[in-house]
Amino acid sequence: MAQFEWVHAAWLALAIVLEIVANVFLKFSDGFRCKIFGLLSLAAVLAAFSALSQAVKGIDLSVAYALWGGFGIAATLAAGWILFGQRLNRKGWIGLVLLLAGMIMVKLA
Protein backbone atom coordinates (compact mmCIF):
# COMPACT_ATOMS: atom_id res chain seq x y z
CA MET A 1 0.00 0.00 0.00
CA ALA A 2 1.27 3.43 -0.90
CA GLN A 3 1.96 5.93 1.85
CA PHE A 4 -1.01 8.01 2.98
CA GLU A 5 -1.34 11.39 1.34
CA TRP A 6 -4.00 14.01 1.96
CA VAL A 7 -5.14 13.75 -1.63
CA HIS A 8 -6.52 10.30 -0.82
CA ALA A 9 -8.48 11.73 2.11
CA ALA A 10 -9.84 14.40 -0.24
CA TRP A 11 -10.98 11.69 -2.67
CA LEU A 12 -12.67 9.89 0.21
CA ALA A 13 -14.41 13.09 1.32
CA LEU A 14 -15.61 13.63 -2.25
CA ALA A 15 -16.92 10.05 -2.38
CA ILE A 16 -18.86 10.65 0.84
CA VAL A 17 -20.39 13.90 -0.44
CA LEU A 18 -21.36 12.26 -3.73
CA GLU A 19 -23.02 9.37 -1.89
CA ILE A 20 -25.11 11.83 0.14
CA VAL A 21 -26.05 13.73 -3.02
CA ALA A 22 -27.03 10.45 -4.68
CA ASN A 23 -29.29 9.53 -1.75
CA VAL A 24 -30.99 12.94 -1.75
CA PHE A 25 -31.54 12.74 -5.51
CA LEU A 26 -32.96 9.25 -5.03
CA LYS A 27 -35.50 10.60 -2.53
CA PHE A 28 -36.41 13.42 -4.93
CA SER A 29 -36.85 10.87 -7.74
CA ASP A 30 -39.88 9.42 -5.90
CA GLY A 31 -39.10 5.84 -6.82
CA PHE A 32 -37.75 6.90 -10.24
CA ARG A 33 -41.07 8.53 -11.15
CA CYS A 34 -39.09 11.74 -11.70
CA LYS A 35 -36.55 10.35 -14.15
CA ILE A 36 -34.13 13.30 -14.10
CA PHE A 37 -33.51 12.91 -10.36
CA GLY A 38 -33.22 9.15 -10.81
CA LEU A 39 -30.58 9.60 -13.49
CA LEU A 40 -28.76 12.22 -11.40
CA SER A 41 -28.77 9.75 -8.51
CA LEU A 42 -27.21 7.03 -10.67
CA ALA A 43 -24.59 9.47 -11.99
CA ALA A 44 -23.71 10.54 -8.44
CA VAL A 45 -23.33 6.90 -7.34
CA LEU A 46 -20.99 6.20 -10.26
CA ALA A 47 -18.99 9.32 -9.44
CA ALA A 48 -18.87 8.30 -5.75
CA PHE A 49 -17.45 4.88 -6.62
CA SER A 50 -14.93 6.51 -8.96
CA ALA A 51 -13.79 8.82 -6.16
CA LEU A 52 -13.64 5.89 -3.74
CA SER A 53 -11.46 3.99 -6.21
CA GLN A 54 -8.99 6.87 -6.12
CA ALA A 55 -9.11 7.03 -2.31
CA VAL A 56 -8.17 3.36 -1.89
CA LYS A 57 -4.92 3.97 -3.72
CA GLY A 58 -3.61 5.44 -0.47
CA ILE A 59 -6.06 4.26 2.20
CA ASP A 60 -6.66 0.62 3.12
CA LEU A 61 -9.86 -0.61 1.49
CA SER A 62 -11.37 -1.77 4.78
CA VAL A 63 -10.81 1.63 6.40
CA ALA A 64 -11.92 3.66 3.37
CA TYR A 65 -15.07 1.60 2.86
CA ALA A 66 -16.02 1.69 6.54
CA LEU A 67 -15.55 5.46 6.70
CA TRP A 68 -17.35 6.01 3.39
CA GLY A 69 -20.32 3.94 4.44
CA GLY A 70 -20.46 5.19 8.01
CA PHE A 71 -20.14 8.88 7.28
CA GLY A 72 -22.47 8.47 4.32
CA ILE A 73 -25.16 6.94 6.53
CA ALA A 74 -24.74 9.54 9.28
CA ALA A 75 -24.78 12.47 6.86
CA THR A 76 -27.70 11.04 4.89
CA LEU A 77 -29.57 10.78 8.18
CA ALA A 78 -28.84 14.48 8.81
CA ALA A 79 -29.92 15.38 5.27
CA GLY A 80 -33.16 13.44 5.71
CA TRP A 81 -33.80 15.28 8.96
CA ILE A 82 -33.07 18.74 7.50
CA LEU A 83 -34.59 18.36 4.03
CA PHE A 84 -37.47 15.95 4.61
CA GLY A 85 -38.29 16.16 8.32
CA GLN A 86 -37.45 12.48 8.86
CA ARG A 87 -36.70 11.42 12.43
CA LEU A 88 -35.12 8.36 14.03
CA ASN A 89 -36.71 6.37 16.82
CA ARG A 90 -34.73 5.09 19.81
CA LYS A 91 -33.57 1.94 17.97
CA GLY A 92 -32.35 4.07 15.08
CA TRP A 93 -30.28 6.26 17.40
CA ILE A 94 -28.78 3.20 19.08
CA GLY A 95 -27.86 1.85 15.65
CA LEU A 96 -26.23 5.15 14.70
CA VAL A 97 -24.17 5.19 17.90
CA LEU A 98 -23.05 1.61 17.25
CA LEU A 99 -22.16 2.54 13.67
CA LEU A 100 -20.02 5.47 14.82
CA ALA A 101 -18.36 3.31 17.48
CA GLY A 102 -17.55 0.71 14.84
CA MET A 103 -16.02 3.35 12.57
CA ILE A 104 -13.80 4.53 15.42
CA MET A 105 -12.75 0.95 16.18
CA VAL A 106 -11.85 0.29 12.52
CA LYS A 107 -9.82 3.49 12.38
CA LEU A 108 -7.95 2.65 15.59
CA ALA A 109 -7.27 -0.97 14.61
Curated annotation (Swiss-Prot):
Q: Where in the cell is it found?
A: Cell inner membrane
An example Gene Ontology molecular-function term: antiporter activity
UniProt keyword annotation of Transport present: yes
Q: Name the major location.
A: membrane
Listed InterPro entries = Small_drug/metabolite_transptr, Small_multidrug_res, Spermidine_export_MdtI
- Membrane-crossing ranges are 6-26, 36-56, 64-84, 88-108
Q: Name one GO cellular component term.
A: plasma membrane
Query: One of this protein's GO BP terms?
Result: glycine betaine transport
Q: How does it assemble?
A: Forms a complex with MdtJ.
The free-text function statement in the UniProt record for this protein reads: Catalyzes the excretion of spermidine.
Q: Which family does it belong to?
A: Belongs to the drug/metabolite transporter (DMT) superfamily. Small multidrug resistance (SMR) (TC 2.A.7.1) family. MdtI subfamily.
| Name this protein carries in UniProt | Spermidine export protein MdtI
